[in-house]
Regions:
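Conserved catalytic-core segment of nucleotide-activated headgroup transferases in glycan assembly
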Residues: 169-211
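Active-site proximal beta-strand in glycosyltransferases
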Residues: 85-115
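Aromatic "clamp/platform" in nucleotide-sugar-dependent glycosyltransferases that forms part
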Residues: 237, 249
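Short hydrophobic beta-strand element within catalytic cores of glycosyltransferases
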Residues: 254-257
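Active-site donor-binding segments of glycosyltransferases and PAPS-dependent sulfotransferases
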Residues: 33-89, 214-215
């Protein structure tokens, strides 16, 4: 196997990010390319199970990741530069001599103008400038990317539709997290009101974690919860995809989520959209969904087509 591709996953830490990495690994592992994974020393999944994958590990913190071409060993940077391509996950990477791709996975630096996100946006734009392609998943993300990079854009996200029976077990499930973007305080208040007004309905608050060591257990636990509910409540401010929305829809749940850009792919056949940050609106939409006589939904299933990347190398 003479051809190789590097996946730089040093910036990946969320469950959603790990799922995207797994999707890429599964496709590339079946191709003609030798897979090389560059990761930090905190990552325990998903790379420890395949002995055919070449692994390069760094202990450098996130601040150094845009400069890994300087701080990695000569052996490691030579291995990377000798590969056919590198795909940077987590919004930005570092300069290399091969064909490079940057996958945008976090919209916050493009939306929020605090000190941290201004710095991140600088590195993102620098990575976009250095990259041959900017890879994105869904169309609303492309609208956030500076127009001077439009010629580099490559879309890999696909949404499939299909009719599915709505789950018969009645209840509401929402995912909460310490991450500010997940808007968990708002979700907590809305679900509290629903439980007070309608105590007969089951309310489940699933606590997500950024700890990768427990990610597989988390994913299994969440997938087991979906069939026990018929309503999925979402509250995030921003999403590049919002994987739980599609997982819940595919699992037979009706979606209640804010009327935000990332919800543009859903309609009234599979969702109710509430006014963002409006507790009364969200509470009313959940109650309307619970009292609906709907039996089937037009479910949405999300996936990535990594062959588009491979074909462009």
């Amino acid at each position: 196997m003479d051809k190789s591709i590097v996946l730089n996953i040093c910036g990946v830490k969320s469950l959603g990010g790990l799922k995207v990495v797994n999707s890429a690994i599964n496709t590339i592992s079946e191709s003609e390319y030798q897979l090389i994974i560059l990761h930090n020393n905190n990552l325990t999944e998903p790379i420890d199970t395949d002995s055919n994958i070449i692994k390069i590990e760094t202990s450098l913190k996130r601040f150094f990741h845009p400069f890994l071409n300087i701080f990695l060993s000569r052996k490691d940077i030579t291995t990377i530069n000798n590969s056919d391509a590198i795909l940077h996950f987590g919004n930005f990477g570092f300069k290399t001599k091969n064909k490079s791709y940057t996958l945008i996975q976090n919209l916050l630096p493009l939306e929020i103008k605090d000190f941290k996100n201004i710095i991140l946006k600088y590195f993102i734009n620098k990575s976009f400038k250095q990259s041959d392609y900017i890879v994105y998943q869904l169309d609303h993300v492309a609208e956030k990317i500076n127009i001077r990079f439009k010629s580099k854009l490559m879309k890999i996200g696909i949404i499939d539709k299909g009719e599915k029976d709505l789950n018969t077990e009645i209840g509401v499930i929402g995912i909460m997290s310490k991450t500010r973007n997940k808007n968990s305080n708002f979700m907590e208040e809305v679900l509290k009101r629903v439980s007070v007004d309608s105590p007969e309905y089951k309310i489940t608050k699933f606590i997500s974690t950024e700890n990768q060591k427990h990610s597989e257990k988390n994913l299994i636990s969440l997938s087991e919860q979906y069939p026990k509910h018929n309503i999925y409540f979402h509250a995030s401010f921003y999403e590049t995809v919002g994987l739980p929305l599609y997982e819940a829809s595919s699992a037979g749940l009706f979606i209640v989520a804010p009327d935000s850009e990332y919800m543009m792919y859903f309609d009234n056949s599979n969702s109710i959209k509430y006014k963002p940050e409006d507790i009364e609106s969200a509470t009313r939409c959940i109650k309307d969904a619970l009292n609906s006589n709907k039996k089937t939904i037009q479910s949405l299933h999300y996936k990535e087509d990594w062959n588009l990347v491979l074909e462009s190398i």
